[in-house]
Amino acid sequence: HDDIGLGFEDSSIAAAGFNAYEHRKFLKDYYSGVHPGSPASGALFSVNPKTQDARISGSLASLCGLEKALESRNQSLIDIAVKKILLMQAQSFFVGGIPMLFYGDEAAYTNDYSYLNDPGKSYDNRWMHRPLIDWKKNQKTKEAGTIEHLIFSGTQKLLKLRKQLSVTADHKNIRWITPHNIHVSGFIRSLGDDHLYCLFNYSNKAAYLTWYAFKEQGYQIENLYDHWNEKRYSVGADYEYLIIEPYSFCLLAAQKKS
């Protein structure tokens, strides 16, 4: 991304039971770090003083909390930020279109504030997410255990899966899943007899999704293979459930009953 706009339809937010003005205010406050407890380190760009509309600047890593986590040297918060970054990238890559990386995202670059020392850039905070490349940092993408390696290898795996799974090619084949759990964003990509359930848990708590959610489309499913976590699940009774860990996601390929 460059600066992020909040150009959604007010009616869409109202249909979800929220006030569009207050929803925008929350997003602006959260990602600019003003909201109490927000882990994000962003900034507002192009603020309209009359309407209070604004856009959001900041690198993906900083908006997901990595900058503050590193400053506090809190390993738990660092781990959460890494999970959030891959969660955001996963939904972006698998929802359709051409997967796009904003440079620096592949190595978890946080905001670069050096632009403030340049009179030709200091007036425009979008430069914070247009970092100068640090080649020593880039080398860390090859060092197992580093944040850079976790993000780089995770991003590579996501792109490999997107390329490998033909059902994710752009066939306008997305169907959004009934929101049985409000914290889970989910859709199905279908092509012929192939069905891929893409599920993303945006909560800081584990999400429970009943197996009925995988049956209500009428597919006769026996088990599901998660390409991301490389695990197989047997589909249980309607009242039993799949557990998705906090800030985690699943890419579940359906396998029919024989």
Kindly give the residue locations of the regions a language model identified:
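Active-site and adjacent substrate-binding regions of carbohydrate-active enzymes
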Residues: 2-258
